[in-house]
Amino acid sequence: FDEVVVAVFINSTKQSLFTVEERIEMIKQTTSDLPNIKVDSWSGLTVDYCKQNNIDVITKGLRAVSDFDYELQQAQVNLQAGVDTMFMATDPAHSFLSSSLVKELAKYNGDISTMVPPSVQQALLKKTGGK
């Protein structure tokens, strides 16, 4: 892809540990060496964001079959609006990860160094009270 947009979506049904601004900053720090990355935020449907920004393809990582069931439904809805979805299999070493697991480990000083970039690790430890 010539340009990759990493969009932080505001989900009112989830309680995020970090603000949208904090999440955007962590993504920018993590991807600073990749010149074709654009970081943005959006409140609404992903497909509407794509249409408004002339994006034809959404890429999604899949950890397990349970991810695929949900994501396939979303992909079919998005395809009706003219936006395709490309699925990428997660590295098996990371297929068990979830944000709740990483937050729990950080809270109790578990080693998350192989699970998140260093800047995210620092932010998580600070936010959760870990050391």
Tell me the role of every PLM-derived stretch.
Residues 1-131:
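Nucleotidyltransferase catalytic core that binds NTPs
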